Amino acid sequence: MALRLSFMGTPDFAVPVLHALLNAGHDIVAVYSQPPRPAGRRGLQLVSSPVQNAAEAKSIPVFTPQSLKTAEEQARFAALSVDAAVVVAYGILLPKAILEAPRFGCFNAHASLLPRWRGAAPIQRAIMAGDKETGMMIMQMNEGLDTGPIALSRSIAITENITAAELSDKLSHMGAELIVEALSALEKGQLTLTPQSLEGVSYASKIKKEETQIDWTKSAEVIHKYICALSPYPGCWCTMTIGGKPERVKILGSRLATGDSLGIGRIEAGHLIIHCGQGRIEITHLQRAGSRILDSSTFLRGANISAVF
């Protein structure tokens, strides 16, 4: 038996979940996504979210309210008379009236092993912290920030050089499988909900602009984790002296190199191996402003780097 659902999500991360629900035969009567955003150099063009584009391609009605706090929006949502709402990286607060409208409630696919990394940036924070594993959890939502009881979970290892983009892709597809499994159990009356532990709670705050600038006085290990966590968006950056002129460059790939540091900011000749506060790091992919992403060997053929800071 198919469930009557609403789907609420915004970025690319949520699209595989939407597709999985459709492939499982569920009736998605409406999709909610954040409003189109200005794009382009002048911000004159409005661009729809990946979820909105995916839903419209399947001829599913899409709603893009700025907020769900108004009585009008809450009445419109309640009128859908859905069995459940599936929420994946929607980015808009769900008030109590929205949470309680579906027959079985609202279910969120969250990219962490709760209660660790509640909040907006769980994938990035897990990599930054050097966590050895993370995962996806399906929880029934309540009014707290990612505090609802857990229906299903699955873990995955965080390898040394995996980027946020690569990990996000793996977790997105994992979440798609889990939500279909959870809804199948829900239909059969077999879904078990387990309260979250009161221990091990941590919060994954949004990434701040000042966190994206590389501080070469930190250890190579810490810098590498930040580069992986912020690749490709928003991307770490540093200033390089190229052809005698300072230039801001995005650093989008790295790996740890052997050897002790012989001086912060020192660059090894013929390589993009940079000495840090402790240890050395090899830059593998980087991007100058207005240019495409290059591997380090290609980059070095067209750029004479004399300093980094």
From Swiss-Prot:
Keyword rRNA-binding: no
Record's GO cellular component terms: cytosol
InterPro entries reported in the protein's UniProt record: Fmt, Formyl_trans_C, Formyl_transf_N, Formyl_transf_N_sf, Formyl_transferase-like_C_sf, GART_AS, Met-tRNA-FMT_C, Met-tRNA-FMT_N
Catalysed reaction equations from the record: L-methionyl-tRNA(fMet) + (6R)-10-formyltetrahydrofolate = N-formyl-L-methionyl-tRNA(fMet) + (6S)-5,6,7,8-tetrahydrofolate + H(+)
SUPFAM superfamilies: FMT C-terminal domain-like, Formyltransferase
Similarity remark: Belongs to the Fmt family.
Role noted for this protein: Attaches a formyl group to the free amino group of methionyl-tRNA(fMet). The formyl group appears to play a dual role in the initiator identity of N-formylmethionyl-tRNA by promoting its recognition by IF2 and preventing the misappropriation of this tRNA by the elongation apparatus.
Stated name of the protein: Methionyl-tRNA formyltransferase
Organism expressing this protein natively: Bartonella bacilliformis (strain ATCC 35685 / KC583 / Herrer 020/F12,63)
